[in-house]
């Protein structure tokens, strides 16, 4: 039986005019081999759970496959606030679309496939370390429940790639509901290709926002949906302590899904000024700046949509960003604290918590996980996370008093056990700390991929106890704290 039997393919983007893309044949790597195949996810598309040579040959571009029509998308974007017209898929190719078991179509994108017309000064390759980081983080985010692109698998090779040192080329099979970015609309706006921009908007509505087609102003409704989805994504980032690192408009998905994992980082010590990108000298994309930058990016998108949407409608939609962000962030933080009843004083409780975390530089993830264990542990386990134990004790007393006000639908007081069981499904025990990723990369570069596979499995269930992996909850060693990652990939 064919491995493709029962898998449905299409390629709607390839039906658009030539202004949208260029067809490109993947440039083969030497001795390509599987590093990891995401079998559990693959089965959701009708693909086999285990990797094999047929899958390798087709996805690596070594064998022609009728449903695939590899193409490089053209787009533009604002990078660190400066418009760059010369962007596009410089090392990745959109192969086709594949239908999920729930009926949703997902793009299949091969990253590291070689030169394209948009490679600029690059070589079109992706190195092993950056490919491992993107694979692990996209799957870690999915495990956490944060909107994200996914990864179907990754491969390494014997092809040398020259960066600061000689490395080896790798391939990532990225899967996403769309690869359309803010920068697609910007490209057509700034090149005055307004008919193409209108066509793009029509297709985005048809493919991704069909409900907007019934609206009085479909394009305005589309933009409002993009604003809302972006606000929700940012709320997740801030609640879970994720720093993206390179929030250029060409890295912003129209569906509010975390896109293009480069110099990302999860908070270790709580530091709102955390900068994970080694190249971000001004801190433009620092952790606490992410909501502001998302709104800036949406404003740039709004400007590019001005031929399609009236100014007052664009401004009205932008005005809803902070409202939706605040609503979603509050909802997520309440869940993390086990507080489902709204009380006016909660804002002060939240503020005091963040101030305490910041002043003591306590570990963000461990703090919330310990709060989730107060049904089986003493409050001292939380207090001991802080240098200023007196202040921590005072806050914990306030928090526990607040928990006493929680009641269920029947008006009954919520027990600590019930509260904490829910919190443990919201506050992860495991996250992809940068030092863990680096250890896996170091081993992989020596030919040992066991740690990559171990992390990939562990991070699928970040909320579960998995006691055999307790070592992965350790705080980072000195060398692994607040790691700044290079954009070099």
UniProtKB/Swiss-Prot annotation:
Task: Identify the residues that bind ATP.
Answer: 88, 90-91, 111, 123-124, 174, 181, 260
Class in the EC hierarchy, top level: transferase
Cofactor(s) required, per the database record? Mg(2+); Mn(2+)
Q: Name the residues that bind Mg(2+).
A: 251, 260
Q: In the record, what terms sit under GO molecular function?
A: AMPylase activity; ATP binding; magnesium ion binding
Pfam short name (any one) = SelO
Disulfide bridges in this chain: none
Q: Which UniProt keywords apply?
A: ATP-binding, Magnesium, Manganese, Metal-binding, Nucleotide-binding, Nucleotidyltransferase, Transferase
User: What InterPro entries does this protein's entry cite?
Assistant: SelO
What is this enzyme's EC?
A: 2.7.7.-, 2.7.7.108
Q: Which domain of life is it from?
A: Bacteria
Q: Which residues form the active site?
A: 250
Record flagged with keyword Nucleotide-binding = yes
Report the catalytic activity.
L-seryl-[protein] + ATP = 3-O-(5'-adenylyl)-L-seryl-[protein] + diphosphate; L-threonyl-[protein] + ATP = 3-O-(5'-adenylyl)-L-threonyl-[protein] + diphosphate; L-tyrosyl-[protein] + ATP = O-(5'-adenylyl)-L-tyrosyl-[protein] + diphosphate; L-histidyl-[protein] + UTP = N(tele)-(5'-uridylyl)-L-histidyl-[protein] + diphosphate
**Family membership:** Belongs to the SELO family.
Q: Which HAMAP family match?
A: YdiU_SelO (MF_00692)
- Biological function: Nucleotidyltransferase involved in the post-translational modification of proteins. It can catalyze the addition of adenosine monophosphate (AMP) or uridine monophosphate (UMP) to a protein, resulting in modifications known as AMPylation and UMPylation.
Q: What is this protein called?
A: Protein nucleotidyltransferase YdiU
